């Protein structure tokens, strides 16, 4: 996408998938990971990343599986999978605990990761946070015509 390039770009391996990421800012600075929302990619942060880096952070962003330049796996994509992807990214690439800032879906992934791996996440900035009821399983419903009496 034109105008969405920023920072150094590379890939990392998560399970059997290739995942895209980018970063900017000095390596010795505190780490801040930006997570995009549904239908976006790490390029979403093009107008923010350099300013955040100038404020004193090493800024990272990755494309969640199924988005941007990361692999598009077949099958079900869900918050737990994306949280495992973020955990892998924090361990393999960032290499130290980080602040996670997410937009919509990215907020949910950041919060989930903070719950399961508080050793990797210093804090989460959720802007905005989607409705948490989206995590609840939907009740199994059957059409009235398929019910048996």
Model-predicted segments: where are they?
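Helical cap/lid subdomains and adjacent loops of hydrolase enzymes that gate the active-site channel
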Residues: 1-2, 127-149
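A generic fold-level signal
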Residues: 6, 14-16, 26-27, 116-120
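Active-site loop/oxyanion-hole signature of alpha/beta-hydrolase fold enzymes
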Residues: 6, 10-17, 22, 54, ...
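Conserved catalytic-core motifs of eukaryotic protein kinase domains, centered on the activation segment
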Residues: 44-46, 70-76, 135-137
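Short, hydrophobic alpha-helix immediately C-terminal to the catalytic nucleophile
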Residues: 46, 87, 111-115
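Glycine-rich, phosphate-binding/catalytic loops in enzymes
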Residues: 49-52, 76-78, 116-119, 126, ...
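Conserved hydrolase catalytic core segment
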Residues: 93-136
């Amino acid at each position: 996408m034109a105008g969405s390039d920023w920072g150094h770009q590379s890939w990392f391996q998560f399970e059997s998938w290739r995942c895209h990421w980018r970063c900017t800012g000095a390596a010795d600075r505190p780490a801040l990971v930006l997570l995009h929302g549904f239908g976006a990619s790490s390029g979403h942060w093009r107008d923010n990343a350099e300013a955040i880096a100038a404020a004193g952070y090493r800024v990272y962003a990755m494309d969640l599986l199924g988005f941007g330049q990361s692999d598009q796996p077949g099958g079900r994509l869900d918050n737990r999978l994306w949280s495992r992807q973020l955990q892998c990214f924090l361990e393999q690439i960032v290499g130290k605990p980080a602040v996670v800032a997410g937009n919509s879906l990215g907020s949910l992934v950041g919060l989930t990761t903070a719950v399961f791996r508080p050793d990797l996440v210093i804090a989460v900035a959720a802007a905005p946070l989607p409705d948490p009821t989206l995590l609840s399983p939907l009740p199994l419903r059957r059409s009235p015509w398929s019910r048996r009496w």
